[in-house]
Amino acid sequence: MAAKMKKGALVRAVKETLENSLEAQASDSRFPSYLFDSKGEILDLTDEYALVRFYVPTPSVWLRLDQLELAE
C-alpha cells in the first residue's frame, strides 16, 4: 500500500500500528484523536516516512508509511 502513497494524498493514522510502535514507547503514547479521526495531507515522502499535515493548528508530523492508510 505504501507504493500508492504520494505527495498530496489524503491519509489517516492506523491506531493499532501507531500505538504498538517504537515511537510510542519512546514518548507519550497518548495520541490526539485527530490523528485517527481526520484526514491529513502528505507533504513530503522518504523511503520509510511521510510528513503529514493535519488540518488542525498543530505542526506537521513524520509518520512511518506502515502507520498510515489512504483516506477515502
From Swiss-Prot:
Subunit comment: NDH-1 can be composed of about 15 different subunits; different subcomplexes with different compositions have been identified which probably have different functions.
Main location: membrane
GO cellular component assignments: plasma membrane-derived thylakoid membrane
Enzyme Commission number(s): 7.1.1.-
Topology relative to the membrane: Peripheral membrane protein
MF terms in GO: oxidoreductase activity, acting on NAD(P)H, quinone or similar compound as acceptor; quinone binding
Keyword NADP: yes
Entries under InterPro entries matching the protein: NdhO
Superkingdom in the source lineage: Bacteria
Entry protein name: NAD(P)H-quinone oxidoreductase subunit O
UniProt record similarity statement: Belongs to the complex I NdhO subunit family.
Catalytic reactions on record: a plastoquinone + NADH + (n+1) H(+)(in) = a plastoquinol + NAD(+) + n H(+)(out); a plastoquinone + NADPH + (n+1) H(+)(in) = a plastoquinol + NADP(+) + n H(+)(out)
Localization: Cellular thylakoid membrane
The species this protein was found in: Rippkaea orientalis (strain PCC 8801 / RF-1)
Function: NDH-1 shuttles electrons from an unknown electron donor, via FMN and iron-sulfur (Fe-S) centers, to quinones in the respiratory and/or the photosynthetic chain. The immediate electron acceptor for the enzyme in this species is believed to be plastoquinone. Couples the redox reaction to proton translocation, and thus conserves the redox energy in a proton gradient. Cyanobacterial NDH-1 also plays a role in inorganic carbon-concentration.
UniProt keyword annotations, A-Z: Membrane, NAD, NADP, Plastoquinone, Quinone, Thylakoid, Translocase, Transport
